[in-house]
Amino acid sequence: MFTGLIEEMGEIVAIDPLGDSLRLTVRGPLVTGDAGHGDSIQVSGVCLTAIEFGAGGEGTFTADVMAQSIRMSTLGALRVGDKVNLERAARVDSRLGGHIVQGHVDGTAELLSATPGESWRVLRFSLDPALAPLLVDKGSVTLSGVSLTVSDVSEAAAEEPWFEVSLIPETLTATTLGLLAPGDRVNVETDILARHVARMLAFKNLTPSGEGATA
């Protein structure tokens, strides 16, 4: 589990194709400082398992990206030199400064517009119609690993759903969201509670009427 509070921006230093998967090597001196083999590190919102670390204090780690993660996220489009958001898995005694983030991406969204304010920026993204019911005004959403509050959403009947988030200066400078231009895509993870409610509602009329169920 993660909190969506990015610890550092890392850099892709190597990409090695492995059949239908990828092996990424990422530079992140902070997140690798106390990491060990098998630890979880979210890379721009995708939970990956660290399998190797650079020797001699290089501050790099290597992780495999499976075919499904490539299909569902932006990781397959990364190039050497690209910046990524990094966060270590939360501990039991961690402060939950953002919200519960699993690192399980639901899909991607395209940046439609970026409207600057005095010291902030409002970003509007497209949204897969299947995900639209899972986002609510003032609810939580994770974009490329960053925990954010939804500041506006399109009407329920909109043919092309969208949503907005407002970024403070700290988020603009400390994460890759400040580097985005219209047309760029981000990884989207909706709130876990919203996903569970939607799933239960889908089974509302199929639930057995008895007191228990047998498999």
Can you name each region flagged by the protein language model?
Residues M1-A215:
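Conserved loop->alpha-helix
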